[in-house]
């Protein structure tokens, strides 16, 4: 697989993707309106953001009882985003088993041009047919190895090779839990760069659950990553993603070219993205527990809901989810954990953590 047909301006050192309208969907409980999406896409496009991701938080087909229903159908939002953007490319996420091949085709028909396919970091093989279809359709392809903190660099590189051989043009180290710390990112990105060579680029997607989203992204770039994700105003799951406006400020200072104007992206974050957020993404106890315990960031809202439903502490739910090594798609097990803690409370046996 060649990287020559990847959308990449030669003046860039890295290509930025803003995922406010996908990862941010978790924080907003998938309640984006067309007006919000149109305004955010226009502001990001004006600032020079080259790629904007738009989908339900859990990807194509994610609007469901298990993950939460979308206020506006995601395909309508993809179409609106593609019609609004003048320069930026519109990306969409899909998880095999949640989205389908038909969803990919519909997203392309609606103007999406970059297909990002996500699997758990040990299950790259389930993405093979989807990458094949995406390349047949002429879509650019990106692979997400989620929860990358859970396996060592050499095993992650083996999974990246599966994606690249299937047609993936850039494989991401995805720190879904915000649990990786500096050298953990560097070692994983370097392992993927060494394995993939010129066959595919390497990317990094970070979360702020330990406050390291920006620093980890810098480590990724220094280790050879060519694509970096972030969200304006940290608009994402958990404590949010690495804030794009901060990333651009830091990259400007260390000489990493992105093509994004710092002042324009700061304006977009403050004046357009922030008003669309239900609240700021906080580095609070719940978020810290997720980073510390290695919990998938989108579990936060689900844990809060079960906490309120069963009268048990959300941070205890999240800590036990980490102990059980739950992954994306197992959100329903938070109910079992809540009932377990409730029984312990009733018997007076609940531990402090």
Swiss-Prot record:
Its EC number is 4.1.3.39. Keywords: Aromatic hydrocarbons catabolism, Lyase, Manganese, Metal-binding. The keyword Phosphoprotein does not apply. GO terms for biological process: catabolic process; L-leucine biosynthetic process. Mn(2+) binds at residues 23, 205, 207. Substrate binds at residues 22-23, 176, 205, 296. Belongs to the 4-hydroxy-2-oxovalerate aldolase family. This is 4-hydroxy-2-oxovalerate aldolase 2. NCBIfam families: 4OH_2_O_val_ald, PRK08195.1. The record marks 22 as: Transition state stabilizer. One of its GO terms (molecular function) is manganese ion binding. Residues 14-266 form the Pyruvate carboxyltransferase domain. InterPro entries: 2-IPM_HCS-like (IPR050073), 4OH_2_O-val_aldolase (IPR017629), Aldolase_TIM (IPR013785), DmpG_comm (IPR012425), DRE_TIM_HOA (IPR035685), PYR_CT (IPR000891). It holds the Pfam family HMGL-like. The active site is at residue 26. It catalyses: (S)-4-hydroxy-2-oxopentanoate = acetaldehyde + pyruvate. It is an enzyme of class 4 (lyase).
């Amino acid at each position: 697989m060649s990287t020559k047909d990847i959308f990449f301006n030669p003046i860039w050192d890295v290509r930025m993707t803003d995922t406010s309208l996908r990862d941010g969907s978790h924080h907003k409980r998938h309640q984006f309106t067309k007006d919000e999406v149109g305004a955010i896409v226009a502001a990001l496009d004006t600032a020079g953001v080259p790629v904007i991701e738009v989908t339900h938080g859990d990807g194509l087909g994610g609007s469901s009882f298990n993950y939460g229903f979308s206020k506006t159908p995601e395909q309508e939002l993809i179409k609106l985003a593609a019609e609004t953007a003048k320069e930026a490319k519109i990306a969409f996420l899909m998880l095999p088993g949640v989205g389908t091949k038909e969803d990919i085709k519909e997203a392309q028909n609606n103007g999406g041009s970059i297909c990002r396919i996500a699997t758990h970091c040990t299950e790259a093989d389930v993405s093979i047919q989807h990458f094949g279809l995406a390349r047949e359709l002429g879509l650019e392809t990106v692979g997400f190895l989620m929860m990358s903190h859970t396996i060592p660099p050499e095993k992650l590189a083996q999974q990246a090779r599966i994606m690249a051989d299937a047609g993936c043009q850039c494989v991401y180290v995805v720190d879904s839990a915000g649990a990786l710390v500096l050298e953990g990112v560097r070692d994983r990105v370097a392992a993927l760069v060494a394995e993939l060579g010129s066959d595919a680029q390497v990317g990094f997607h970070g979360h702020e659950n330990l406050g390291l989203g920006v620093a980890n992204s810098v480590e990724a770039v220094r280790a050879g990553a060519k694509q970096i994700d972030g969200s304006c105003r940290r608009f994402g799951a958990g404590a949010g993603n690495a804030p794009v406006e901060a990333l651009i400020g830091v990259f400007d200072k260390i000489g990493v070219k992105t093509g994004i104007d710092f002042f324009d992206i700061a304006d977009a974050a403050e004046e357009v993205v922030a008003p669309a957020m239900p609240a700021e993404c906080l580095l609070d106890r719940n978020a810290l527990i997720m980073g510390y315990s290695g919990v998938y960031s989108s579990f936060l809202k689900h844990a809060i809901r079960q906490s309120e439903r069963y009268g048990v502490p959300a941070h205890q739910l999240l800590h036990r989810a980490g102990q059980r090594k739950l992954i994306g798609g197992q959100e329903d097990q938070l109910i079992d954990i809540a009932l377990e803690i409730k029984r312990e409370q009733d018997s007076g046996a609940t531990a402090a953590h």
